Amino acid sequence: MSGHSKWHNIQGRKNAQDAKRGKIFQRISREIYVAVKAGGPDPSSNPQLRLMMDKARAANMPKDNIKRAVDKGSGAGGANYEEITYEGYGPAGTAIIVSALTDNKNRTAAAVRSAFTHHGGSLGASGSVSYMFDRKGYIVISREDLDKNEDDMMEDAIDAGADDVQTSEEVFEIYTDPKEFAAVRDALEAKGYTLANAELTMIPENETMVPEDKVKQYTGLIDELEDNDDVSEVYEAATLPEDAE
């Protein structure tokens, strides 16, 4: 697992994402819709829906928006979405995984390929970069929200089944096996911890530093991918120079 903080990357792009909040809500609504279609409207018996609702709350998505997405998914008919994963290399050989939810594979594939090509990258075959990432549960607790002793919190996380706890000045980052993620999340919430973030994600085993002369090209690629309405998540094995973040 890379030693570079995933939370650092999340916070580093927060302002840009805030400006795209409407699109983020639209994507999460689509993910909630698909989760309800697949497993029903009750999050207690639909783990994927619970995960998407947690994601919605973490993004400060209004409750009315969440309810509308659940109600829409509970109705008959509607679009059929398919989850597709693309893998490729950005400028300077940075590994990138793109997760998309689409009702038109040809449209999405063309747009993703164009983004990579336009910004000096290349779209690869399935498996070309995914081996560089590990599927992990990822939970964040802010120091500001911590009411307990730090050692007690770390012990609670490990006892709940976490694989690793990393600390920084601002947060505790808790990593779990994907199969243990829900159990660890629920155990920590049951003990009264406030979770700043909780998700299943892809963690790079190593990260490539993007050279300064490639930063604009690289961030342009990530921005174009994230601006695509069909794209749900972009996972990066890259670190930007501090003055570029």
Curated annotation (Swiss-Prot):
Keyword DNA-binding: yes
Pfam families registered for this protein in UniProt: TACO1_YebC_N, Transcrip_reg
Alphabetically ordered keywords of this record: Cytoplasm, DNA-binding, Transcription, Transcription regulation
UniProt keyword annotation of Cell membrane present: no
Molecular function GO labels: DNA binding
Major location (coarse): cytoplasm
Region Disordered, annotated ranges: 1-21
A GO CC annotation given for this chain: cytosol
Disulfide bridge positions per record: none
InterPro entries: Integrase-like_N (IPR017856), TACO1_YebC-like_2nd/3rd_dom (IPR048300), TACO1_YebC_N (IPR049083), Transcrip_reg_TACO1-like (IPR002876), Transcrip_reg_TACO1-like_dom3 (IPR026564), YebC-like (IPR029072)
Subcellular localization, as worded in the UniProt entry: Cytoplasm
Highest taxon above the source species: Bacteria
GO BP of this protein: regulation of DNA-templated transcription
Family: Belongs to the TACO1 family.
NCBIfam families for this protein: PRK00110.1 (NF001030), PRK12378.1 (NF009044), YebC/PmpR family DNA-binding transcriptional regulator (TIGR01033)
Protein name per UniProt: Probable transcriptional regulatory protein PEPE_1240
Organism, as annotated: Pediococcus pentosaceus (strain ATCC 25745 / CCUG 21536 / LMG 10740 / 183-1w)
